[in-house]
UniProtKB/Swiss-Prot annotation:
Organism: Stenotrophomonas maltophilia (strain K279a)
Protein name per Swiss-Prot or TrEMBL: Formamidopyrimidine-DNA glycosylase
Active-site positions on this chain: 2-3, 58, 260
Record function comment: Involved in base excision repair of DNA damaged by oxidation or by mutagenic agents. Acts as a DNA glycosylase that recognizes and removes damaged bases. Has a preference for oxidized purines, such as 7,8-dihydro-8-oxoguanine (8-oxoG). Has AP (apurinic/apyrimidinic) lyase activity and introduces nicks in the DNA strand. Cleaves the DNA backbone by beta-delta elimination to generate a single-strand break at the site of the removed base with both 3'- and 5'-phosphates.
Co-factor requirement: Zn(2+)
Amino acid sequence: MPELPEVETTRRGLAPHLQGRRVHGVILRRADLRWPIPPEVAELLPGQRIEDIRRRAKYLLLDTAIGSAVLHLGMSGSLRVLPGDTPLRAHDHVDISLDNGRLLRFNDPRRFGSLLWQPAGEVHPLLQGLGPEPLDDAFDGDYLFARSRGRSAPVKTFLMDQAVVVGVGNIYAAESLFKAGISPLREAGKISRERYQRLADAVKEILGYAITRGGTTLRDFISPDGAPGYFEQELLVYGRDGLPCPNCGRALKHATIGQRASVWCSHCQR
């Protein structure tokens, strides 16, 4: 599933092609995505100028004066800006045509993505109750320490809770905990403020670097220009169970934590 760096890579790739453009029309070939596409998307979006394209957590918002189209890539979704006469491929579910003859095409083989509508001045229910962005100043060791008090869940589960912090999925949680030297099994409420500061710093560093590398291509993610993400080539623990730890050489451990595959070094991470 695309995580924060992949979604941010998508946003940055789309922004120069969408900002300031006016929507000419919307074609919905399949409306039965993870949630049905509401009729407001096709009824209200045509004629509107795209003022901005923003990211909140793993959602992309195409802002107009009357509201925002809210997009989620799901497990396998992709967004591409293409010439208006580009032939259809399998799973091309939505076209948003623009005033310059080009179009924004949403392709989603597994149909776990979504396209929703948020009226101006409102916050869509899916965006309510979300934690801070991990790259914002509000996300630091003090914040994590305060939020973790009384929490008995493993720290990896805690870190992946979208109400705690958004956009830190399985890949980047594993890599951040490794860099911070914290076992993913450690009880969240028993980690010191100092160790949480190391973890917050690791999350910021790893996510920031992954964005510069275009995200991680494991199965389905391709950026808007068709390029894969290259951070996969630099993963230190994720997907490497049984292989030597890059720090100490001991075999990396594997377990299921919170129903997610987890890999770590039991020697370097305590």
